[in-house]
Amino acid sequence: MLNEFRTFINRGNVLDLAVGVIIGAAFTAIINSLVNDIINPLLGLLVGGRTDMSNYFLPLAGQTATTLAEARAAGPVLAYGSFLNAVINFLLVAFVIFLIVRTANRFNPKPAEPPALPQPTPSERLLAEIRDLLAQR
């Protein structure tokens, strides 16, 4: 059983997946920092001076609150700033993954096309015709 597990782990796809998950987890921290520390302050500067986009919300029950946590404690809230952060994170991660995959595909050789089947010789065609005629009888 241990040998089977070792064989399973040593397959290329499993190792590639494990490396991808680990790198992806580490990369998420970089993207979160990029969004929270660089992009959000720039967007906040454009839309009203707030650098924390997660504090943009709309209380649905008419309550007033200064922070998202207070608004959530008071009732239902449409937290569109948090959603905007999540969308920006997703788009950046998806774009970077696209760039990585595109670059990796350039380095991976494309599999060779299988050679075309050889055309039958004239004698093989004649034998096939004879076979077909005999089959019709």
UniProtKB/Swiss-Prot annotation:
It is found in: Cell membrane. It is a multi-pass membrane protein. Pfam families: MscL. InterPro entries: Mechanosensitive_channel_CS, MS_channel, MSC/AndL, MscL_channel. One of its GO terms (cellular component) is plasma membrane. The chain crosses the membrane at residues 14-34, 81-101. One of its GO terms (molecular function) is mechanosensitive monoatomic ion channel activity. Keywords: Cell membrane, Ion channel, Ion transport, Membrane, Transmembrane, Transmembrane helix, Transport. Homopentamer. Channel that opens in response to stretch forces in the membrane lipid bilayer. May participate in the regulation of osmotic pressure changes within the cell. Belongs to the MscL family. This is Large-conductance mechanosensitive channel. It comes from Chloroflexus aggregans (strain MD-66 / DSM 9485).
